[in-house]
């Protein structure tokens, strides 16, 4: 089993959390913008969603909130991520869809945050989404992701969201 490493600094985690608090008050509009953009970028994703999109938007925002809160202790989400990956697989989500979702997410954040969507914020959110998407894809492919939260002067804290070859239980999400 192969593990992929994603590094985030405490500052990047803080930026994601800080800017997400600005999204929460506009979460319904942000979710609607997200899906509108996703369907424009990748029309094949439209058929993956059945039912009420407002409810789907609420689920999206709840999932983002959970990820944002868990970025510095991602191992607490392993069970949930594995379950989500398996549901996505049953719905027909393919690996390339995660690229479209990431692009739609960054665009939505840019629209919602306006001047607060700085290059540093973009990079922080891109890394946070990388943690999520690579974890979901890795869960299905038998790979894992190691999240490194960089500390000062070379010290770091490692969170592994990967299988036994990485020394941690497999994805239980």
Indicate where each model-derived feature is located.
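Globin-like tetrapyrrole-binding proteins
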Residues: 2-173
């Amino acid at each position: 089993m192969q593990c992929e490493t994603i590094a985030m600094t405490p500052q990047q985690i803080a930026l994601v959390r800080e800017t997400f608090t600005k999204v929460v008050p506009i979460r319904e509009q942000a979710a609607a913008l997200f899906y509108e953009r996703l369907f424009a970028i990748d029309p094949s994703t439209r058929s993956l969603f059945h039912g009420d999109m407002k409810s789907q938007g609420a689920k999206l925002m709840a999932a983002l909130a959970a990820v944002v809160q868990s970025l510095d202790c991602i191992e607490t989400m392993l069970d949930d991520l594995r379950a989500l990956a398996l549901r996505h697989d049953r719905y027909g989500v393919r690996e390339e869809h995660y690229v479209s979702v990431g692009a739609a997410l960054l665009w939505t954040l840019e629209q919602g945050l306006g001047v607060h969507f700085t290059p540093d914020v973009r990079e922080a959110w891109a890394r946070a989404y990388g943690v999520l998407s690579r974890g979901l894809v890795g869960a299905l492919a038998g790979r894992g992701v190691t999240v490194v939260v960089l500390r000062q002067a070379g010290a770091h804290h490692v969170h592994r969201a990967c299988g036994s070859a990485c020394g941690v239980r497999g994805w239980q999400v």
